[in-house]
Amino acid sequence: MACGLVASNLNLKPGECLKVRGEVAPDAKSFVLNLGKDSNNLCLHFNPRFDMHGDINTIVCNSKDGGAWGAEQRESAFPFQPGSVVEVCISFGQTDLTIKLPDGYEFSFPNRLNLEAIEHLAADGDFKIKCVAFE
């Protein structure tokens, strides 16, 4: 995967929302949005997989604590199409993160690290970011 956007010092607090809009590559295999304290401490690893690591059209979410991955959570909802422009909204809560997909479907992922602020955002893979907004 090519290295994409990395942003730090975001200071996203509980109750706030991060919107990421971008273009999925026409030949997409997978892309990643990571949120957390830094690259070794992620409260959310959001990884839509078109065809990667044995997963087909599956969203894999995880956390990373001190460099160690947690248990994966898989979502079968998959509203992503290669070559399309999509928006993902991630609402940061004290106990969990709510991810709203482009088709309006929402699911939650626990804030396993109990972070009080998200400082780090990284995007990677077959996804070109067009806009990042904070609400």
From Swiss-Prot:
GO terms for cellular component: cytoplasm; extracellular space. Residues 4-135 form the Galectin domain. The modification N-acetylalanine is found at A2. The keyword Cytoplasm applies. The keyword Acetylation applies. It is found in: Secreted, Extracellular space, Extracellular matrix; Cytoplasm; Secreted. A beta-D-galactoside binds at H45, F46, N47, P48, R49, H53, N62, W69, G70, A71, E72. Keywords: Acetylation, Apoptosis, Cytoplasm, Extracellular matrix, Lectin, Phosphoprotein, Secreted. GO terms for molecular function: lactose binding; laminin binding. InterPro entries: ConA-like_dom_sf (IPR013320), Galectin-like (IPR044156), Galectin_CRD (IPR001079). The modification Phosphoserine is found at S30. PROSITE patterns: GALECTIN (PS51304). One of its GO terms (biological process) is apoptotic process. The modification N6-acetyllysine is found at K13, K19, K29, K128. Lectin that binds beta-galactoside and a wide array of complex carbohydrates. Plays a role in regulating apoptosis, cell proliferation and cell differentiation. Inhibits CD45 protein phosphatase activity and therefore the dephosphorylation of Lyn kinase. Strong inducer of T-cell apoptosis. Homodimer. Binds LGALS3BP. Interacts with CD2, CD3, CD4, CD6, CD7, CD43, ALCAM and CD45. Interacts with laminin (via poly-N-acetyllactosamine). Interacts with SUSD2. Interacts with cargo receptor TMED10; the interaction mediates the translocation from the cytoplasm into the ERGIC (endoplasmic reticulum-Golgi intermediate compartment) and thereby secretion. This is Galectin-1. It comes from Sus scrofa. The lineage of its organism: Eukaryota, Metazoa, Chordata, Craniata, Vertebrata.
